[in-house]
Amino acid sequence: MAYPNDVRNVWDVYNVFRDVPNREHLIRDIRNGLVTVRNLTNMLTNMERDDQLIIAQLSNMMKSLSIGVEKAQNELSKLKTTDADRAAVLAAYQTSVLNIERNTMLLTGYFKQLVLDLTGYVGASVYPILPFMITGDQSMMVDSVKVNMKNVFDDKHEQEIVLPIHPACFVSTITEDTSSVVYADGDELYSVHVRHATMTMYVNVLGETVETRQLSMIGESIVPDDFAPSLLILRFSQDSVGEVFYLSHGNMKKFLGYSLEYTDKCSIFDVARRVSTTRNTIPNGFCSVDGVPYLDGRFIYQPSGVSADSNICAIYNSYVLDTLRYITECEVDTLRSVYDQTSSTSFSKTDVLTSSLLTMQSNISALSAATPQLANDVITFDSTDLLSLGTVLTVSNEFTADDTILSTSLAGHCQVDYSEGSPQDKSMSISVSCDSSQLVSSTVHSYSADILGHGLKGDRTMNLMINVPGLMNPQKVTVDYVYSDGYKLNFASVVAPGAPFWINATLQLSVSPSAHNMLSKLTPLDNDACPGLKAQANTPILVSMTINLDDATPALGGEVIQNCVFKIHHGDDVYSFVTDFDVVSYTSTSGTNCLKLISSVDITSQLPSDMVIYVMNGSPDAAFTSGDSVNMSSVDWHQSTSQTVGNYVYTTMKAYWNVTSYDVEARPYTTYVPGKVNFTAVEHADVFVDDYNTGVNSYVIVNSRIYYKGTPLYIEVPSGSFIKVSYFTSPLKNPTVDTYNAEISRNSAYLIKANASLDSVATMLNNISNRIDAMERLMEPTRAQQIAGVVSSIGGVISLGMPLLGAIVVTIGTIISIADPDKQGIDYHSVANAFMSWCQYAAVCRYEYGLLKRGDEKLDVLSFMPKRVVSDFKNKPDVISLPELGESVLRGSSTDYLDTGINIIYNDMQLLGQGKLSGWLNKTVSKVENNAANFFERNLVKSLANKEVLPMHARVEITQTEKIGDVYRTTILYTGINEGSYLGGDVFASRLGDKNILRMNGFESGPGRFKAIVESTTEVGNFRVVDWTVSGMSRYEIYAAAGEIYPSKDPSHADVQLLYESIVRDLTTRDGSFVLKHHDVLLLPGQLDAFEELIIRNASNYQYAFIGSNCQNYAHDVVDILTKFKRPQRWIKDDDFKLYIQSIYDAL
């Protein structure tokens, strides 16, 4: 449409265009002085063009959904900006779409944070504690700059401070160029600059531009990653040295050479925000905030007591549900709001549902983008030439400056020559030492080859390498020598003392048993010997292959379906080997967590090894050094023989050549000094190619060759060879750091097997038309008000507006449950039944109450409890009389507390000290309990509670009310770690309620219980504590629960009653306690007694651990036992659990 140019002022324009689309935005700009008459025409023209683009986008989005709502498409295509009514609806849709997109970005950001959680961060939400806008909320800042930043759990872990950078903060409120700068110790730590004209954001960390993002919401497509939060992490170790990490959607950077002092654990941040303008309508502003953010619930931990993968599954599952619960609640409100706005108009219900369809598509797209998907890849390798093994050899030099001496023993003999007579020989061995000090800096093989392969996900490169472990380990090698044929080394010559000069001894070295026979002379040294390092017998020769899976999710792993074959050529002989690929999660040198395939095959399985010689190259300064190396002992050369004849003695001198024995010895301090060695450039290597031979199974490494029994070896990966692998893709490709390696191989097999269920759900719920019909029925005025109640009854997980999303979420939870059956205590048959029930419920809301149908009529009552039954139950113990104490106690102050079912109660145990952080946590938990918390507070507390790492003590309160004649009896069973009487072995002395626990038998921890029973004959809530004997607890147990030492003489009945009532008083006074989880359950007859007997029998099996098996994990197990009949396999015996079930059946 055309816009007039003859208006007198901006206010005339306002009056003319007050009904145009986006009028609120236009009015705001006029009032702020951002619109002038001169540029108004251009602005409105651009606005109309943008509106038309939005209309086209909405139409395309609906077409891409493949839904059968032709009427909606036709009506939408008729919408024009000149139609005020239609334009208003379009504007509402447009606003809804933008809100949904923002929610989707938020969801994507949370999934990114999940990846951090999966790798060792116990994470709550990441929210903008440091607001970027000048008018931002500063309520989340700590007031004082001197704040104790102790780790919540203990002081043994590294300290993390996380600063989020949220691009979404700049999208709708920034109308000028803006900069935000964060300082550490007076230096600029990072800065964020937004250019309004191009809506581009630049992030600089320590002076380096780390990323650039486009923040425009208008265009053909929106890139979710541009709106995902980035994290700046400062990690302080125990030595107070800080490291700086920057995590974005695409990469992670670790800044080296930069450190921060953090010795006093106080604030190091000064945050300044500067706003500069391009016009003079907004004055320059400056805002400074001093302080530090809250720790945001993020701590490094190492799980104990259970496997790491168990924690991964729990964190992933609970966080997905929490996040989607928030998204679902927002969308239900939007859906109802749109319906209310248009119910009186002529628009069809299909028109009304348009925004819901967009919501569904947006969230499905976000979930698909953030949820790991199963990928089945076949990697096929191209043809390769034969590679000499020496060209892909990598040797690790393990010599140090201290490893200077290597010793060996060479065989030799001594030959004594005479001018007359026969020569005499004496065999001996000569000890030779090698001064290896120069080997530390020697040049060794460091080669590999990349072989190109092609897969369904693109090109893959396989790195091929030969490894010989310990080849340069001074503890595993000796020095040996290679000799030329017929070689003899004249080591030294000596003459016996007093002997004629023609009698002498020559010491010679002969070929040692382990030496190699060279057919051609090899002369790198003057003494004709070529030294080498000889590895031990049976040293493996490993062919290592590595393939990186860059698009995989490291925490979920993968599974190799089929390996391939490679060949080793030895002359005319060819040996075939099968690869042994395994899936490994590792952290790269850049700190990125990755997944790769690794195969390692030992070729000595078919080519056995007696020795491996790594030949050195002789250097000019290499030489043998020795002192007086040979010594011949003195001989009495004037020895004579005598003969007596009669009275005469005849003497005859002995000839020199008749001396038959000489003592010749070798000195042990002969040393070889090789100098600095280049193992990759041995001289005269050609003799190994043609003339080398040996009779033993020997490997000799010379330059680019590895000889086996005198013949070089070659490797081949045949053309067309392929491997099959299944893994889970990581669309967001989020990097992580400081990960722990879960047992991914076991998880992966279960996950891959469960993928068929995910596909079947998508197929079952793909008919969007049926979903629309169901939604239209729900949108009838008589039932519209039930939407919030229906969603609430499902727990906020599945929205009827997006059933496919709900089904996928449930599938994720099911897959993760299957991935760790030991932790979940389930069998696959029950999982399948539960999974199908959830999917059916996601498609059509069939029941007003409850979720699951187990197909067991006796136990079905535990699947649901109608709200009206709870509401109609008036006889609750509001006031409890304690006759022995002469007191009455009023039940807790929580308005939504119900004396039916199961409560998980949390108490502050001062784990955070007594400072502001502890006070903030108690205040926040109280707000969550009373439904007064904001989203971020609620998400923080519930995320930690769902992960069972909330820094509080948890116990379970199980309440059952029965009417016996005219008497109402309420039984309250309290159970928890170190609560009441310890149920195995020694007894704990512990105080219940809001008191501190006092341990009396060391630091061992285990389950305990206390049973409180009250009765009433009225319906006004006045109850009276029964006699302690009715509870079935012994005197000893009651004294233990009261924290008292049992007296040497049995106490009186009245004394025990006094203690019993005091415990009931402490337990029923709920000051300082918080009920964060309530379960509406009607326990079956006999179930409470059967449960008590079950935990008494198995309490000693519970192995307490601070993470993974703590008081909150125990509380979760108790709820599962009572409500889901799920056996915690790590501490409940199967026979005892079957007895528990049978006892309930017998009572029924």
Swiss-Prot record:
Residue span(s) of domain PPPDE: 929-1148
Gene Ontology CC: one annotated term: viral outer capsid
Protein name (database record): Minor outer capsid protein P2
Entry function: Minor capsid protein present in the outer capsid, which is required for adsorption of the virus onto host insect cells (Potential). Could play a role in the host plant virus induced dwarfism.
Keywords for this protein: Capsid protein, Host cytoplasm, Host-virus interaction, Outer capsid protein, Virion
Recorded family membership: Belongs to the phytoreovirus minor outer capsid protein P2 family.
Subcellular location: Virion; Host cytoplasm
GO molecular function, one term: peptidase activity
Subunit structure: Interacts with host ent-kaurene oxidases OSKO1, OSKO2, OSKOL4 and OSKOL5; this interaction.
List of catalytic residues: 953, 1111
